[in-house]
């Protein structure tokens, strides 16, 4: 067979058979880790797709390679790289690391011949094909379709497009994409495949039909000759590889493959085409055996195509009525004395009758039901025949475990290969291999499901390991905000699973890309102080509250006018000076602009000095006593020591260290008598956490620069009403101020109430071996999936699992379940920074005396 395409424009192609075909690129639906309700919706969308089609159609799932250069370009998108040498180095190292690692994605396509509503349309298309053949014979230039022909085809294609459910987001294919599909088939298995062209930004505008004419609105409307497709040399069984007298020529059963030699490559592709010839007699269990989607579980590319012939249920019922009458006659003729014979194959008629009745019942469930005749083809390629057959054998054996039989028909490899091409007519072998079912039943195969995660560009957060086809997962927090969506992140994991590592990975990349971060570090090991060593030293500010080298005095870091407001809030929580009490009113008077200027107040230390001269028993004296209670302790240095330089709010990374600062327990906060007896240290700690969270809010909400607030072990903040209120502000209003919050804890309930938990769109759940905590984490990840035993087992047993030695293998560290901003869920592995100094600084694994990691 020759290349079937004569010419094309937009998503339309005119073929040698006289039929015009149209092709759309489809978007897969999330499925693998979705809740049962979401899976049911996906099956219903597939059912609507099959029930909306009529006649012939082809569904394609092709594995597209992803060029490492494109990964680098996505990481650079939106970054002024000239002033970001650290990010440029990270991208360069990422590019080097991807050079030998195959990454890719699966692309989905629907292509269908356009059956004209009038005989003249079909006659015109046939005449065009005959004329093209004659011109080829006479060596004359081919005639391109006229504007009227394009317009007519566009109208018919629009009807097909309207039948495609919007959930699959159909976009009209371009000639570039159609050429890529043909080239991909010729280079299958050679690792030479180029990435699939990006779909147009407005694919639905490929044809602008007005007054019966097609107007070229962009490059996609240009008529492209079929010569754009390279003509391959097809050699079934690789006969050209055999010596003239080789005995292998007489053993064709051992050579069930197709050798494809493309003009685009000096190397031939060896491909095995498998066709579905048998399925479980009793059907398959759904969810659980979505058999077409199973191809993504292989760690090598497997393309698939489904040739469909869809017939309305009413037409099938009329046909089956005739079959029923014939079957009744056969049963009557084979009956003896009114009893059906079971000898000489007569007994099988009862099985036929039962099958016919079951099929009729299935068709009668809905007036929209259709009959689907589907020929399913899998294509596996390699650079040599042995590898191709080995991979194909693995596919066959894997499917055979579920009672699905795939065979490589002898002598039919070339026909199956062409059957996977848009525009190629259906040949006899393909029709003979069709499996007959209903639209509802075939929808349970859910072929159009995607494992895509993350954003189109941004920082490289993780590798997608949901399926055997690994690909990069990008996180574009700024882009998400610009799309008017929240970009806050929640991290949940048990101890040592990697939530702190992930938080530091995100924060470090954000700083390298030009953003700002505010991180509260409460760890005794001061791990974020260590992490700060990998950041820009002149733009990083560390504030150790217990051993301060910088002051957090609000009057000094904000200025007296703005700082006065923060002082009143701080003293309310720390000293019990309520704004409307006598002491609160006195404090407000002292910090008024007039008195501040008169008294020379520039800091809390100077304010305390002014109050030192107050009359005994006065409100000023009482304020001085309360302030001295804190100022004279080591706790108070960070607020009252004027010898310390004030915190520089211009720093790109601000990291307060709160290790050693105790906090009241939730029980103490809930019981008044316990709260009244709190130690000074706990009162101070509670007030400072609330102040730090407010400080973070002030910094993040007062700049146009993209800023991130990070709270590891966030229960230290959310246990207090003040801290919880500030966190809720971040989650509610961060988007408006170009800011996000990143919260981490062992339990999602630590993020706050149901409102706070629900306002976190990007959710990451790492290893949780405790079933109860794992269920809570999964219920937060997506309501409903906690009851799925398969997903619960996946989280507790197969996310960064420990080996027999109690250690997690290096290649299994950092695994997690991720729900992205588009609410798609999949399994990922967090990638480590490529720069060695950053990688060392964000690790929290203890090391022994020999320098080796202890865990």
Predicted regions and their residues:
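P-loop NTPase motor domains
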Residues: 36-54, 315, 418-472, 522, ...
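P-loop NTPase motor core of the ASCE superfamily
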Residues: 489, 563-606, 752-855
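Switch/coupling segment of Walker-type NTPase motor domains
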Residues: 60-77, 88, 98-99, 501-596
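Conserved P-loop NTPase motor cores
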Residues: 471, 477-497, 501-509, 518-527, ...
